[in-house]
Amino acid sequence: REILSAEMIHRACLDAGLDSRYIFIVDSMDPLRRVYSFLSPEYERYIGCPLAFIPAPDSNGNPDPEAGSYADHFLTPFLEALGQIGVFPEVIMNHETYSNGEFAAKIHSTIEQADAIREIIESISGRELDENWFPYKPLGSDGSMDGVTVTGYENPFVHWTDRHGKSGSADIRKADGKLPWRIDWAARWGIHGVTCEPAGKDHGAAGGSFDTGLPIC
């Protein structure tokens, strides 16, 4: 429904003679959260890895390196279905926005104001963040965001150690990691000039990501 709500607003703006740009941001930098029922156990190794960087499943649910990315695998039929009803948004892959450096300034600003952002999230959401919380999630040696601890920051590099005992540095100008959702969403508003965005009611609930996003943005 969010897609069609945005389409209706976009068309109404154009009909009224206003400038309107309708973009659809694909959460391709988001991690695989678990092995779903249609996936083989082989996907266990990809938990925590960005959807853009893991292989699509074949007909048996096994990772197929020749079939493109997991993100594209599920995005393609969705866009085809939208096209059948005349909806053609401008598609933006979020991992590409990270990889081309558009997030860099937002990430740097976020890290510099980490304490203030922690206070915003905790006071508005009513939940306490972990003592090791850091407003940027770098990818570890296995490509996963899970089990990675930030050890320092020297712009543009976030230094880390992971669950395998390995250390490294993530370049905030590349897709070496991502902002947590509540911060990522707010950053997109500024990067893409978003002025209107339909969203699920959970985001708009008291203490939700919209409430924390406004002061962060």
Q: Model-derived features: where do they sit?
A:
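Alpha-helical recognition segments enriched in aromatics with Gly/Pro capping
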Residues: 113-119, 123-217
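N-terminal Rossmann-like or analogous alpha/beta NTP/dinucleotide-binding catalytic cores
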Residues: 1-118, 207, 211-217
